[in-house]
Regions:
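Feature captures the catalytic cores and cofactor-binding loops of soluble hydro-lyases/lyases
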Residues: 1-168, 182-228
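C-terminal binding/interaction regions
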Residues: 172
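Channel- or pocket-lining gating/hinge segments that regulate access to a cavity or pore
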Residues: 178-180
């Protein structure tokens, strides 16, 4: 039902930082350079945790006191386990400004047990010490002290968080720099492109750090075709 990549590719991607992933994607010219990633408003709450990679599971939340029936947590859990592991939760908060936090110690533990590696939300999070100790990554717009009346409004639909529209099953990577989507058609080629770009950039870096640096040499290095 959902497209996947190999375990080897997942492992390789999880060892690469977000900026290098984005540079590599640019090298394949599969999308405009200003698309495919969440805006800086969605920040990594735990900048010391390693990159996480997973398949998106999407939903919509609100912390305003609801009227009528809200989405069942059981249905939400069923949706989560229908998506291949590892899972990357993406929740759009319809409250403006964001109010109560869906994410904290309990939800972090529940969703980690369900195979999720982290969450990206334009809402809020809390219980930071406990979530950090758990190793469950939070990418969020802000922090809130309360969960208020937080509840699920919709699940499994495309959502836009931080300017990035995400569908359930999309491949995402997040690290201390933010969150980016990874096109399936090039996912397995990204590690090699990362190495190619690193070799290209190394020429400039080594020149700038060398005792023989000169403006003429910098201009000469600048003539080397960019791989991205």
């Amino acid at each position: 039902m959902y497209e996947t990549v190999s375990q080897a590719t997942l492992k390789a991607l999880s060892g690469i930082d977000g900026p290098s992933i984005c540079n590599a994607i640019e090298g394949f010219k599969v999308r405009p350079k200003n698309l495919g990633f969440m805006l800086p408003e969605i920040r990594a709450i735990f900048s010391d945790l390693p990159p996480v990679v997973g398949y998106a599971v999407t939903g919509v939340i609100s912390a305003v006191q609801q009227e009528g029936r809200n989405v069942s947590r059981d249905d939400w859990y069923d949706l989560i386990v229908s998506v291949p592991e590892p899972r990357f939760i993406v929740l759009h908060d319809i409250d403006n400004p964001p109010l109560g936090a869906f994410w904290g110690e309990v939800q972090g533990n529940i969703h980690k047990a369900l195979g999720a590696v982290g969450v990206a939300t334009d809402g809020t999070v809390r219980d930071l010490d406990e979530a950090h100790e758990l190793g469950f990554q939070f990418f969020a717009k802000d922090v809130s002290v309360s969960h208020a009346y937080v509840h699920l409004v919709e699940i499994g639909i495309p959502v836009t968080v931080g300017g990035l529209t995400v569908s359930t099953g999309d491949l995402l990577l997040g690290d201390k720099h933010g969150v980016t989507s990874i096109p399936f058609e090039i996912a397995d080629k990204i590690p090699e492109m990362v190495s190619t770009i690193a070799a290209f950039e190394k020429k400039t870096i080594e020149l700038c750090q060398s005792a023989s640096f000169s403006l003429d040499k910098l201009k000469e290095v600048g003539k080397i075709p960019r791989p991205y």
